[in-house]
Regions:
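Nucleic-acid substrate recognition interfaces
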Residues: 1-260
Length: 260
């Protein structure tokens, strides 16, 4: 049946099985995605638990806070440089079109504010040249980080509500957990992945390309690519913005897919 779809998105799938020449690439990427998730969660947890407890800091909590203390100057140097560049760019515009530019400098978390936000941690990882952050394309790492921060936002909101309405809960909301599995799905933007000649999908950090010719891709703009570990295989999902005003959706809601 035809279904109205303002965004006109179409999803195509390819299953990558063991033995495929790109299997090990996707395996490494999904493993790195898990590491990036857990590293982000680790830094947020150590800051939060370290600065909301009355007892002496544990070694890992102290280690993270030391990393922050050592890199806060470098982080703010980068902020100042970005501010100066924006200011110079703004001065080139006619005066009536110029916008006010502010310089947002970072401050270390403390007992009054025992949190780090996304912008702070992203700047810290860049200043540290953090290995897990650099193992993936920057936008992939940032997407994973935003997912972790969303979980923390939900946790803190639940904790706040719990303190006001404890009877609504079976127990105190628990701090976001680490991923125990060996892999996590990864999301690539259309800046990281590119379709070549309507036939090959190019991924970052590899010369290998995925043949998507059998999917019948002929037109539309690639929006994003998801790689999902499933049953010891990998599902590569291409989200395409198709030019048609209507998208044909099968009654069973299945995706078009092929096995490789």
């Amino acid at each position: 049946m035809a279904k109205e779809n303002p965004s006109n998105y179409k999803t195509l799938q390819i299953w990558i099985k063991k033995g495929h020449r790109m299997y090990s690439y996707f395996q490494e990427c999904c493993h790195n995605a898990k590491n990036m998730y857990n590293t982000t969660n680790f830094y947020i947890r150590q800051v939060y638990t370290g600065l909301t407890q009355e007892k002496e800091l544990q070694p890992l909590q102290k280690e993270v806070l030391d990393h922050i203390h050592k890199n806060i100057g470098k982080m703010n140097d980068t902020q100042l440089l970005a501010y100066q560049k924006k200011l110079e760019k703004e001065k080139l515009k006619p005066k009536e079109e110029q916008k006010e530019i502010t310089c947002n400098l970072f401050s270390e978390p403390n007992f009054e504010k025992p949190y780090v936000d996304y912008n702070f941690l992203d700047a810290l990882f860049k200043a540290m040249i953090q290995n897990d952050y650099r193992a993936l394309p920057t936008q992939c790492s940032q997407s994973i980080m935003k997912g972790v921060f969303q979980n923390w936002k939900s946790f803190l909101a639940s904790l706040k509500d719990y303190k006001k309405n404890p009877n609504k809960y079976a127990g105190m909301p628990r701090i976001p957990k680490y991923i125990r599995s060996s892999e996590k799905e990864i999301l690539y933007t259309n800046q990281d992945c590119i379709i070549k000649n309507s036939r090959f999908l190019k991924f970052p950090k590899t010369k290998l390309q995925l043949n998507i010719g059998k999917l019948g891709f002929t037109e539309g703009k690639l929006k994003q690519v998801r790689v999902i570990p499933k049953y010891n295989e990998y599902v590569v999902e291409l989200v395409i913005d198709v030019p048609s005003e209507q998208q044909i959706i099968e009654e069973n809601a299945r995706y078009m897919s092929i096995d490789l």
